[in-house]
């Protein structure tokens, strides 16, 4: 007497067998000690780049510069109120990459709303809150350029980047 298995029953049996075999592989290492990994602090060699003088900035008037290299457009903005990550006499100067984290379109600063807006897919970012993504297609915050302020000569410089600039595997090429 021949026993025929339907296609549906065959798939049920094969799927169950694969699940049991997979569970055995996963649980086989459950009691093993985790491998020790030496995670040292790595610092990317960001350049120190002069951006401008604090007194030369006007509130809500972006100043363009490139950082960390010539193919990375950025803007510095005097927000007019103390801002997280801000530098200067009033801690109100921030800088961000202007490449949208969704598809790399250049964002523009809207002074009336105090936001960066992407014209391609309508993402909106908040420079008052570390470039946080407010709405739109982007899933990451706008990269913030880390600034340093020298009160003696009223200059601020770019010293690093928080976040990944669009289209890169590393901010330093």
Curated annotation (Swiss-Prot):
Q: Which Gene3D superfamilies does the UniProt entry name for this protein?
A: Rieske [2Fe-2S] iron-sulphur domain
Amino-acid positions noted as binding [2Fe-2S] cluster in the UniProt annotation, renumbered to this chain: 100, 102, 118, 121
Using the chain's own numbering, where are the disulfide bonds?
A: 105-120
Q: What induces it?
A: Induced in the presence of arsenite.
Reactions catalysed, as given in the entry: 2 oxidized [azurin] + arsenite + H2O = 2 reduced [azurin] + arsenate + 3 H(+)
* The entry's keywords: 2Fe-2S, Disulfide bond, Iron, Iron-sulfur, Metal-binding, Oxidoreductase, Signal
Q: Name one GO molecular function term.
A: 2 iron, 2 sulfur cluster binding
**What remark does the entry make about the cofactor?**
Binds 1 [2Fe-2S] cluster per subunit.
Q: Report the residue ranges that make up the Rieske domain in this protein.
A: 60-156
**Superkingdom, according to UniProt?**
Bacteria
Q: A Pfam family name for this chain? A: Rieske
Cleaved signal peptide residues: 1-35
Q: Which SUPFAM superfamilies does the record associate with it? A: ISP domain
Which EC numbers does the record give?
Answer: 1.20.9.1
PTM section of the record: Predicted to be exported by the Tat system. The position of the signal peptide cleavage has not been experimentally proven.
Question: InterPro entries in the record, alphabetically?
Answer: AioB/IdrB_ssu (IPR014067), Rieske_2Fe-2S (IPR017941), Rieske_2Fe-2S_sf (IPR036922), Rieske_Fe-S_prot (IPR014349), TAT_signal (IPR006311), TAT_signal_bac_arc (IPR019546)
Tell me its cofactors: [2Fe-2S] cluster
Q: Which NCBIfam families match?
A: arsenite_ox_S, TAT_signal_seq
Q: What does this protein do?
A: Involved in the detoxification of arsenic. Oxidizes As(III)O3(3-) (arsenite) to the somewhat less toxic As(V)O4(3-) (arsenate).
Q: Assembly state and interactors? A: Heterodimer consisting of a large and a small subunit.
Of which family is this protein a member? Belongs to the AOX family.
Q: What is this protein called?
A: Arsenite oxidase subunit AioB
Which species does the entry assign this protein to? Herminiimonas arsenicoxydans
């Amino acid at each position: 007497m021949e026993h025929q298995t339907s296609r549906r029953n065959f798939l049920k049996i094969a799927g169950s067998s694969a699940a049991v075999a997979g569970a055995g592989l996963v649980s086989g290492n459950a009691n093993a000690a985790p491998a020790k990994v030496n995670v040292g602090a790595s610092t990317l060699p960001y350049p120190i780049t002069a951006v401008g003088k604090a007194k030369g900035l006007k509130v809500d008037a972006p100043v363009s510069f490139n950082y960390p290299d010539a193919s990375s457009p950025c803007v510095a903005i005097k927000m007019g109120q103390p801002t997280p990550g801000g530098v200067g006499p009033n801690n109100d100067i921030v800088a961000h990459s202007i490449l949208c984290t969704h598809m790399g379109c250049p964002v523009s600063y809207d002074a009336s709303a105090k936001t960066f807006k992407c014209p391609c897919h309508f993402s909106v970012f908040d420079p008052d809150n570390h470039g946080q993504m407010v709405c739109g297609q982007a899933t990451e915050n706008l990269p913030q350029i880390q600034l340093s302020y020298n009160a003696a000569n009223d200059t601020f410089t770019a010293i690093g980047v928080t976040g990944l600039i669009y289209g890169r595997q590393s901010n330093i090429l």
